[in-house]
From Swiss-Prot:
Region (Disordered): 131-159
Gene field: gatA
HAMAP family: GatA (MF_00120)
Superkingdom of source: Bacteria
Enzyme class: ligase
Protein name stated in the entry: Glutamyl-tRNA(Gln) amidotransferase subunit A
Record GO biological process: translation
Length: 490
């Protein structure tokens, strides 16, 4: 019998339904794997007792012929989602040992369908980062390594723990979040599938906020089908989130096998950036060839304001963060450092509670919102954002979906880029546009680099057309036949 931790989410659900194994058995297998894999540092909180309790409850429901769409499936939860009674810190010192008294809407949706929680997953502090090096718990380690090199590699960020856990078979799938590429970049780095849905599809209630107009929940999973299955359940209208869309959630799982015959796929010329590696260019061309062979029509499109996307993002996101993170003052919850007066207590709590990258972004955000610079920076960035949205509106008059690389590089070693914030920020160059425009985007593993590391392709769809992402993603997955797994060194 296959090792239970090797199963895809879809295969595990089939096995649970047909009683080939119990939820207690598969949950126990994952808990054992987690115990043996702590060197990966994927989990920051393990919940074995809660997991087994949930698994036994699932088994009882399955025995009665009852159960939800995720009944008995063990999942990992990014430490950004509030989980009632389980510590949630967004991997920041300032939240101390904060334990929520309520459940986020996304995780509640999962539990309502019978999912089992294995624990909370590592991430960049407050989701600010592209390498997961800003976590208070230290970075998770990518299960993949370069050929002939033992250097520890980043699993990407900010959802690095989610990507490392799925890639290392430490959960069937995981929740993640994406503000500028934090689902799609880690998925590309770890040979997993990650999708960011349309802004407003999934509720942000109970998600620790970074940049409210950009943050969006989504899954990281082993296959395109698994990601569709999980996203269907994560998404719902929620009156507790004012940005939540009142729209039906389609049957995305059925879209995965519909093919791309008759679809028009746009190739943006502006994504051929200076210095793009030959490997990634070749993979992009291979993706184009696969879609053509599957019956899609390829059209060149233009997204003229692409070059302004990163600068606009790194003004808008820190500005929103400086507003959102003002609530952390050591008074009502989280860590407090006493000062001689109230102001000093605020200053000391924030100075010791926020890490360097978070402090950097808060300073940028406060600066661009200050009265003398608001018009020069923030207002202009919002105008650029509107232009980027209009670029996509025009492009989608010519095509049904857009194909690009997911990342400008493969996974890099820890410390390789952390000394240069600008080089680190460039990791988001292909992903931020979808966040600024509120569009869905999926990263699908499509090949290996010469050094043996995964490479992903990204598909961007029209607003509320995740179906196109899943259709194209399914074809890319079939054509690439990506079955490579990291050699177990841990």
């Amino acid at each position: 019998m296959t090792d239970l931790t090797d199963l895809t989410l879809a295969a595990a659900l089939d096995g649970l339904k047909s009683k080939q194994f119990s939820s207690a058995e598969i949950t126990g297998a994952f808990l054992q794997a987690m115990e043996k894999s702590r060197v990966l540092n994927a989990y920051v909180v393990e919940t074995p007792e809660k997991a087994m309790e949930m698994a036994r409850a699932s088994d009882a429901r399955i025995a009665k012929g009852e159960g939800g769409r995720l009944e008995g499936a063990p999942l990992g939860i990014k430490d950004l989602y509030c989980t009632k009674g389980v510590r949630t810190t967004a991997c920041s010192n300032i939240l101390g040992e904060f334990t929520p008294t309520y459940e986020s809407t996304v995780t509640q949706n999962l539990w309502d369908e019978g999912a089992v929680m294995l624990g909370k997953l590592n991430m960049d502090e407050f989701a600010m980062g592209s390498s997961n090096e800003t976590s208070r718990f230290g970075p998770p380690i990518n299960p993949w390594r370069r050929k002939g090199d033992n250097a520890g590699l980043t699993p990407g960020g900010s959802s690095g723990g989610s990507a490392a856990a799925v890639s290392g078979n430490l959960c069937l799938a995981a929740t993640a979040s994406d503000t500028g590429g934090s689902i799609r970049q880690p998925a590309s780095f770890t040979g997993t599938v990650g999708i960011k849905p349309t802004y407003g599809r999934a509720s942000r209630y109970g998600m620790v906020a970074f940049a409210s107009s950009l943050d969006q929940a989504g899954p990281i999973a082993k296959t395109v089908e698994d990601s569709a299955l999980l996203l269907e359940i994560m998404c719902s209208h929620d009156p507790k989130d004012s940005t939540s869309l009142k729209v039906e959630t389609p049957d995305w799982r059925s879209d995965v096998r519909k093919g791309v015959k008759g679809m028009k796929i746009g190739i943006p010329k502006e994504y051929r950036i200076e210095g793009l590696s030959e490997e990634i260019e070749a993979l992009w061309q291979q993706g184009i060839a696969w879609l053509k062979a599957a019956g899609a029509e390829i059209v060149e499109i233009s997204l003229p304001h692409t070059k302004y996307a990163l600068p606009a993002y790194y003004i808008v996101a820190p500005a929103e963060a400086s507003s959102n993170l003002a609530r952390y003052d050591g008074m009502r919850y989280g860590a407090r450092v006493e000062g001689n007066n109230l102001t000093q207590t605020y200053e000391a709590s924030r100075a010791s509670g926020f890490g360097k990258e978070v402090q950097r972004r808060l300073m940028i955000g406060t600066y661009v919102l200050s009265s003398g610079y608001y018009d020069a920076y923030y207002l202009r960035a919002q105008k650029v954002r509107a232009k980027i949205f209009q670029d996509f509106v025009g492009a989608f008059e010519q095509c049904d979906a857009i194909l690009t690389p997911a990342c400008p590089s493969t996974a890099f070693a820890f410390g390789e880029k952390s000394g240069d914030p600008l080089e680190m920020y460039l990791m988001d160059v292909f992903t931020v546009t979808a966040n600024l425009a509120g569009l869905p985007g999926i990263s699908v593993p499509a090949g290996l680099s010469a050094s043996g590391l995964p490479l992903g392709l990204q598909v961007i769809g029209k607003a509320l057309d995740e179906s196109a992402c899943f259709r194209v993603g399914g074809v890319l997955e079939d054509a690439a036949s990506f079955v490579a797994k990291p050699d177990r060194w841990w």
